[in-house]
From Swiss-Prot:
This is Probable splicing factor, arginine/serine-rich 3. Residues 97-107, 208-223 have a biased composition (Basic and acidic residues). PROSITE patterns: RRM. GO terms for cellular component: nuclear speck. The keyword Aminoacyl-tRNA synthetase does not apply. Residues 108-117 have a biased composition (Gly residues). Predominantly coexpressed with spk-1 in adult hermaphrodite germlines. Directly phosphorylated by spk-1 in vitro on serine residues of the RS domain. Belongs to the splicing factor SR family.
Amino acid sequence: MPRGGSEDQKVYVGNLPGDVREKEVEDIFHKYGRIKYVDIKSGRGPAFAFVEFEDHRDAEDAVRARDGYEFDGRRIRVEFTRGVGPRGPGGRPLQDGGDHRGGDFRGGRGGGRGGGPQRRTGYRVIVEGLPPTGSWQDLKDHMRDAGDVCYADVARDGTGVVEFTRYEDVKYAVRKLDDTKFRSHEGETAYIRVREDNSSGGGSGGGGRDRSRSRSPRAERRASPKYSPRRSRSRSRSRSRSRSRSASRSPSRSPSPQ
């Protein structure tokens, strides 16, 4: 896409409060440049918005400064709508996060900051049947219809992985986006299959049971040497003290009737 095109000037803003107002979104970004429009999408779960600036450089500044910004108790996500971002020599994006078709899921993106830590939840679906030109950003855009996407990646074989911020969105994605028409940024289309990744540890109401099971062995290992001997000694001491107290009280009770 030519430099300065509309996608270069447009940013996605995720994890907004469901009742956010246009003026509030404008207040977050107004100091970075003149805003052409704000389009808020709300419904199930957190709201999100698209903000278009008049100058692509203002959009770049907004992504750098506001991704991860805390608003109304939430950490919002700000990224380019097509992963365009600032470019270096030869027109290559400075934010590495394009289509990682090397065979493994090793470079998917969850936010707009290049190289930043990715927020992972385990609330994951597997997407199969993606066209060869489908990128992680194409997949992320498609799956946003089901909820707030925090991570997406695409492998060489046309399989994708997507993580949502809520488990309810996983169920909704399987129900509503399975066997839907997917379009890549190059216009290539395919019907995709979407299924829950039950091996991710994020299922069954949020994955709390899986994660608690994974923590419990470590907790037991930490607790056993520290507390078990102390508890056993303290119980033995308490029993011995109770016996000594009972022994000391028994003589005092015997002479009482006179």
